[in-house]
């Protein structure tokens, strides 16, 4: 009988998995891969512009 309270506490600590998505997706949701691609693109543009100078006009992307 002493183990019963411990067993109940352990059951309460186990997170239950939802059977359906807790938050439905909307048209505003952006996949994580898209955010990752946008971050990579922004960093690439930053690195390209960092080395840009009047002597290297061909390296400058508008």
Swiss-Prot record:
Instruction: Provide the tissue specificity.
Output: Expressed by the venom duct.
Query: Which residues are processed away as propeptide to yield the mature protein?
Result: 23-48
Instruction: Write out the annotated subcellular location.
Output: Secreted
Question: A Gene Ontology MF term for this entry?
Answer: toxin activity
Output the superkingdom of the source species: Eukaryota
Principal location: secreted
**Entry text on domains:** The cysteine framework is V (CC-CC).
Family, according to the entry, reads as follows: Belongs to the conotoxin T superfamily.
Name the UniProt record assigns to this protein: Mu-conotoxin Lt5d
Protein's organism: Conus litteratus (Lettered cone)
């Amino acid at each position: 009988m002493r183990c019963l309270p411990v067993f109940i506490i352990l059951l309460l600590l186990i997170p239950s998995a939802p059977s359906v998505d807790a938050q439905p997706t909307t048209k505003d949701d952006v996949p994580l891969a898209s955010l990752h691609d946008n971050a990579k693109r922004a960093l690439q543009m930053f690195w390209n512009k960092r080395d840009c100078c009047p002597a290297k006009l061909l390296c400058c992307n508008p």
